[in-house]
Amino acid sequence: MTMAAKTDREALQAALPPLSGSLSIPGLSAPVRVQRDGWGIPHIKASGEADAYRALGFVHAQDRLFQMELTRRKALGRAAEWLGAEAAEADILVRRLGMEKVCRRDFEALGAEAKDMLRAYVAGVNAFLASGAPLPIEYGLLGAEPEPWEPWHSIAVMRRLGLLMGSVWFKLWRMLALPVVGAANALKLRYDDGGQDLLCIPPGVEAERLEADLAALRPAVDALLKAMGGDASDAAGGGSNNWAVAPGRTATGRPILAGDPHRVFEIPGMYAQHHLACDRFDMIGLTVPGVPGFPHFAHNGKVAYCVTHAFMDIHDLYLEQFAEDGRTARFGNEFEPVAWRRDRIAVRGGADREFDIVETRHGPVIAGDPLEGAALTLRSVQFAETDLSFDCLTRMPGASTVAQLYDATRGWGLIDHNLVAGDVAGSIGHLVRARVPSRPRENGWLPVPGWSGEHEWRGWIPHEAMPRVIDPPGGLIVTANNRVVADDHPDYLCTDCHPPYRAERIMERLVASPAFAVDDAAAIHADTLSPHVGLLRARLEALGIQGSLPAEELRQTLIAWDGRMDAGSQAASAYNAFRRALTRLVTARSGLEQAIAHPFAAVPPGVSPQGQVWWAVPTLLRNDDAGMLKGWSWDEALSEALSVATQNLTGRGWGEEHRPRFTHPLSAQFPAWAALLNPVSRPIGGDGDTVLANGLVPSAGPEATYGALSRYVFDVGNWDNSRWVVFHGASGHPASPHYADQNAPWSDCAMVPMLYSWDRIAAEAVTSQELVPA
């Protein structure tokens, strides 16, 4: 070890906060015990609710302060102050969205209980800042000091983590693809081949005029997509699995819930494992550092719940027509005044950036220039209306049944979920937890004319009308970002979602397990069977012998392949090389490679040509639809893809090719520290189509870029038999033994104990700390 490396390691060690002994915390009414188990997971026991949330804020700051502050900065358009020019465009976008204004608005509208929860939580965060404990190493690298927290900051953090997830990116993509391939072919680029209702939208002459206006905005949309970077990829490429099994189908005679949320791999991960108890509740689950409570995955000893993204259409894009001076926008036969102001962001290592913020009746301009006559505005559930999701967070801990839990979520709107639940009485259920505006179905296809008055919101779809079921016949519930309603559902809810492959495979395995056990959940988590192996084998067998020996050998390899994207499979690597070659070919022949002609084409599905075509190719091939091949047949395309793919075969197992790269947000800025900041990774299997959903960027390479941030299984009623895992560890400190200690079991699709009984926690605790009133 060099002296410099030793010094760096010593600095990392010095940044670790003390996790044992006694600490005085202002505002506590009674002592709070914090015990950490062998995986560094905190178990917090307080007397009262306010003390519990205060302690959670303190413990979050102990383990994840840098992450919390960076997320807050990203939410408020201040990340470039730390990350430099690479974060500037994203900062400008969230400033235009008005994040601070809407979060302050939401806080003022919350009930007293939610306000008290938020105040107690940030008081705990601020108590850590004032405690004199060492700061995370990142502050020393940046030469920065932490800033105090205010209650509305937690709302900003929560809103940032679901920022613009879902439909906005699909609408922008179709806007770019439509002039290239036409409406009929653009329909085929839907993720899930969900229906035919889009063929006639927008209709007739209006379509031609709208296409011309939208095409003129293409450079501005390109810039918007580039600004979002990995955030757009998360919004479009992420996903999740979850499922519930009723008592009549389990070996235990009790409900079992399991699943895994899929997002872009960020260090630290967006979730932290916590256990929080007081006189009102005893909850364990995944928390969001910077946010009090358990919004997505948890149980309280009576009811367990978990979520996947429901892909409800909660964002609308409007094409606006402005007067020459850009100060008014057309609506009907009138031009209305628009709000216009100037803002500025600071950029580390560079000059400040000034920019205009323009808002019409529909929302802020996010692409285009009003001074050039046209621009796109966004009206999103996440920003346009007051959100009371944090009121839901205070009600959810008190639920004892699935039905009570669903009633507690009334008004949730920050992001849309399939909320799957099970309770100790034996019920299981599914609810689409979302606020969805009532408006024309046409809004789901493209940006719509903002001047016509025909695409306005007309209130909300009632909570009671959202898709839900409790105790369904058959005793099985599965969601995996698949379509939850048909295109002809009475209320317009969604246009885009993920293909049904993962949901179908999970259901297939559950149906085959009449006595489902907790141990069976890990086997489903680890399922690597590609849904396309049968189609691929049939087409390649019919294709016949290839002219070149390497292409023929590849054809035979793929025909013989068992269809499993296993880490050790060389055939899985060959399949990926072939599918990427076929995707590039279809993208090129269709002309879609020109739809976004800049380096942002490397962003995952939803906004890049190859990303969209990647998902569409299996359906096109299954239907023998060669409409985008410009005169080629599929046999010609398959032969060419075989030939091209042979040039990219490495002979390595899929896991080595697919190994993710976990990158700390400061490692590029401080490369000498990268080896210490970046956690190690291991070979992993799966791809974006398999239940083991470790997805990739088709245009960039085979490396996994998103996957399961966590896996979990709830044994409802026998809570100590529940299990979980996260992809790196409980701590955000690179020197902590718990920074990446869960990566080994995660890579093997194993889980660690979810300790719930306090006597067992006491017996297995590795550290214990008492927080006492100051």
Curated annotation (Swiss-Prot):
Leading EC class: hydrolase
Domain of life: Bacteria
GO molecular function: penicillin amidase activity
Reactions listed under catalytic activity: a penicillin + H2O = 6-aminopenicillanate + a carboxylate
A GO biological-process term: response to antibiotic
Record's keyword annotation contains Hydrolase: yes
InterPro entries recorded: Ntn_hydrolases_N, Pen/GL7ACA/AHL_acylase, Penicillin_amidase_A-knob, Penicillin_amidase_dom1, Penicillin_amidase_N_B-knob, S45
Entry-linked SUPFAM superfamilies: N-terminal nucleophile aminohydrolases (Ntn hydrolases)
Active site annotation, chain numbering: 240
EC annotation from Swiss-Prot or TrEMBL: 3.5.1.11
Keywords: Antibiotic resistance, Hydrolase, Zymogen
Pfam families (UniProt xref): Penicil_amidase (PF01804)
Family affiliation: Belongs to the peptidase S45 family.
PANTHER family for this protein: ACYL-HOMOSERINE LACTONE ACYLASE QUIP, PEPTIDASE S45 PENICILLIN AMIDASE
Subunit organization: Heterodimer of a small subunit and a large subunit processed from the same precursor.
Protein's name according to its UniProt entry: Penicillin acylase 2 proenzyme
Species in which this protein is naturally found: Pseudomonas sp. (strain SE83)
Gene: acyII
